[in-house]
Amino acid sequence: KAIIDSTNKFCVSYKINTAFYECLGSIGWKSMEKTINYLNKNYPEIFTIADAKRGDIGNTSKMYADAFLKNMNFNSITVNPYMGSDSVKPFLEIDNKFIILLALTSNSGSKDIQLKKISEPENENFVFSEVINSSKNWGDDSNTMYVVGGTKPEFFKRIRKQIPRHFLLIPGFGAQGGDLNKICENAMNDEIGIIVNSSRSVIYASSGNQFDKAAAEAAENVQNLMQQILK
């Protein structure tokens, strides 16, 4: 609550990492409900993301979709598209919500699968590019975004050619070392913007009694830096 109250004027979105609530059992679920209810009641203009990375067979995905997008009323949820369109469809069936599909993630292990090349006659492509090509028509830019790691700016222009009008959620800036200048230069275009995520560098800006003020300063610094870049 203190973090939200101190940083909201510098944010367009809050990404709630559900694992840090779920690991606490029923108490954690209650805390997550309190968090999203507080955001929806006090800051309804701020876009909320359930960073849950769900995705399963259709009837199970429907339960996940109902849990986060209906019952908890998040604006969006991160989804793993690995199981295909029928695992994603239940999330898309809920009106006025977004799914955020994993495409190219910021972790070093993304090279193990996402950056593998697929060779076909007269075509060589990365796995992540095939994921985008396959999934971009499951929904459209009014209900689908993509996760693209801020530590991989060399692939942004390639991705923008594939999905010029989809919002990108870009983690990896801040504690993971992504360069905001390179992110903005390569991921933004005249069609649509981006959501740049900075979590640990804001939340853990200080462990002292003034942690909320430190978080506000860290969030404001990010906002100021982005404003300078976008001038």
Role assignments for model-derived ranges:
Residues 1-47, 123, 143, 210-231:
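Conserved N-terminal beta1-alpha1 strand-loop-helix module at the mouth
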Residues 41-46, 138-141, 162-165, 188-190:
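Short helix-capping segments at alpha-helix termini
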Residues 23-41, 57-61, 81-96, 151-161, ...:
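Active-site-adjacent beta->alpha loops and helix N-cap segments on the catalytic face
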Residues 150-197, 201:
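A C-terminal functional module that forms or caps the active site or interfaces directly
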Residues 19-21, 53-57, 82, 104-106, ...:
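Active-site beta-loop-alpha junctions enriched in small/polar residues
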Residues 3, 31-35, 64, 68, ...:
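A general structural detector for well-ordered alpha-helical segments in enzyme core domains, enriched
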Residues 48, 56-147, 165:
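Conserved anion-binding
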